[in-house]
Amino acid sequence: MSRIAKAPITVPSGVEVVVNGQNVAVKGNKGELVCLLNDAVVIKLEEGVIRFAPAEGFKDGWAQAGTARANVNNMVLGVTEGFKKTLLLQGVGYRAQVAGTIVNLTLGFSHPVAYQLPEGITAVAKSQTEIILEGADKQVVGQAAAKIRAFRPPEPYKGKGVRYANEIVRRKEAKKK
């Protein structure tokens, strides 16, 4: 049984939540997010508090209710504070520039890599080797960061590549003769 689903979500001031059947729309100063919940979840909005419970006749009701609660809580946090991912580029000649919604990366290939940011995501190049991605949708921010990292993931021998700011790269020792 999920303990996460039992905890209610208090809606902060300045955030508007609309529940229409299984659709939940959350609107705040950072934007608007919409989510479709599983049929195994019953959602109730009363007096600025959102509560979740499993629907009758579903085997995995509590698990789905816990997932729905986590998703809606991330939506509320996203429209109030937003989410941020920092990427670091390590390697000789590895550079990043941001031009509007396109991130241009020089990662040691014979050609530069241009990544089109998804809608609702903003990028700032703090330096030539640091990119900060920000947005209201946690999943989209993480997915964009993962796609940029996938162009050149950190390799274990020298540590060169694109990494998250808090990522620890496991290093290997070079082969000895």
From Swiss-Prot:
PANTHER family: 60S/50S RIBOSOMAL PROTEIN L6/L9, LARGE RIBOSOMAL SUBUNIT PROTEIN UL6M
Function: This protein binds to the 23S rRNA, and is important in its secondary structure. It is located near the subunit interface in the base of the L7/L12 stalk, and near the tRNA binding site of the peptidyltransferase center.
A Pfam match: Ribosomal_L6
Organism, scientific name: Psychromonas ingrahamii (strain DSM 17664 / CCUG 51855 / 37)
Statement: the UniProt record of this protein carries the keyword Ribosomal protein: yes
Gene Ontology process terms (BP): cytoplasmic translation
Gene Ontology CC: one annotated term: cytosolic large ribosomal subunit
NCBIfam families on file: L6_bact (TIGR03654)
UniProt key word Ribosomal protein: yes
Swiss-Prot/TrEMBL keywords: Ribonucleoprotein, Ribosomal protein, RNA-binding, rRNA-binding
Family: Belongs to the universal ribosomal protein uL6 family.
GO molecular function term, any single one: structural constituent of ribosome
Subunit record text: Part of the 50S ribosomal subunit.
Name of this protein: Large ribosomal subunit protein uL6
